[in-house]
């Protein structure tokens, strides 16, 4: 039976798992690598899930009402998801972000009708968060969803992303890998999968140049969307079994490779997840095992970066 959808938000979630056969063959690995393609969400990334969840929760609590203004510090994808959901729901959106974010991301936000306030790149996400809080004080009837502290973020992954992976693999998942930005994905999916099978290994991925989880050190890096430079409240640090760090170069290399082996255009943080998936797949104990890597977004918002430069 064909279905007509009443809102773009009804199309969020239910993203496909792709068996990355060509990519795996290129690396000669004997594990099964499955890619969870989050760019199939309507605004192109995994963050559509949390944008919808945070807005719906705020509407339920009375924090958002007709005429409210959504203000959020974002490195891009959460802003794009919120801009889309805000447009569909009739809210004004103001987004603060470091000036280091790609031009495509800024233009996308404007295309959805959101207003952008750029902050000092050297201050990273902390600078964007401070600016959002300052704007919220000046703006009546405003609400900050606060993706780095909002429990609706990990909760939506526990409710949707985790079960989708479990059902698609019929419970045959040995490793789950996700990059850590807010930590909502690795937390929600990790908690769900471990509740079904405590032997599932959950791997957190962070930039080699900003190894906050593994070494307690923050630094500048080029893997947009992960490695916020601090440990977010939304991250359950006891859910993952291991942290893998990925270099800028490997994130770019594997992201580009995936486009050229699988014909699927994914972003820089997806490249980081794929690099970690190959690292796991090369281990002798991973032979014959199933590795699910969550690929957060599409590559078309990185055409101005080094991702696809030969």
Predicted feature locations:
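PLP-dependent amino-acid enzyme catalytic core
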Residues: 1-310
């Amino acid at each position: 039976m064909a279905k007509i959808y009443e809102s773009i938000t009804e199309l969020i979630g239910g993203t496909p798992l792709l068996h990355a056969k060509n990519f795996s063959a290129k690396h000669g690995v004997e594990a099964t690598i499955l890619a969870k393609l989050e760019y199939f969400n309507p605004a192109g990334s995994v963050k559509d899930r949390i944008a919808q969840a945070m807005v719906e929760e705020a509407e339920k609590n009375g924090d958002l009402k007709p005429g409210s203004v959504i203000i959020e510090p974002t490195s891009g994808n959460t802003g794009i998801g919120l801009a889309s959901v805000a447009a569909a729901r009739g809210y004004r959106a103001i987004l603060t972000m470091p000036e280091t974010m790609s031009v495509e991301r800024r233009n996308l936000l404007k295309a959805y009708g959101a207003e952008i306030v750029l902050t000092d790149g050297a201050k990273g996400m902390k600078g964007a968060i401070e600016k959002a809080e300052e704007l919220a004080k000046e703006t009546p009837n405003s609400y900050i969803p606060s993706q780095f502290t909002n429990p609706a973020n990990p909760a939506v992954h526990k409710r949707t992303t985790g079960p989708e992976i479990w059902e698609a693999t019929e419970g045959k998942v040995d490793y789950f890998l996700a990059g850590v930005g807010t930590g909502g994905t690795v937390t929600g999916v990790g908690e769900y999968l471990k509740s079904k099978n405590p032997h599932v290994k959950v791997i957190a991925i962070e930039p080699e140049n900003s190894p906050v989880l593994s070494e307690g050190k923050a630094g500048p890096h080029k893997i947009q969307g992960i490695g916020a430079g601090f440990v977010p409240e939304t991250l359950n640090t006891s859910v993952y079994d291991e942290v893998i760090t990925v270099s800028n170069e490997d994130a770019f290399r594997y992201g580009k490779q995936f486009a050229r082996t699988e014909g699927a255009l994914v972003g820089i943080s997806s490249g980081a997840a794929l690099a970690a998936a190959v690292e796991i797949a090369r281990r002798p104990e991973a032979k014959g095992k199933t590795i699910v890597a969550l690929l957060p977004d599409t590559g078309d918002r990185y055409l101005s970066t080094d991702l696809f430069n030969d």
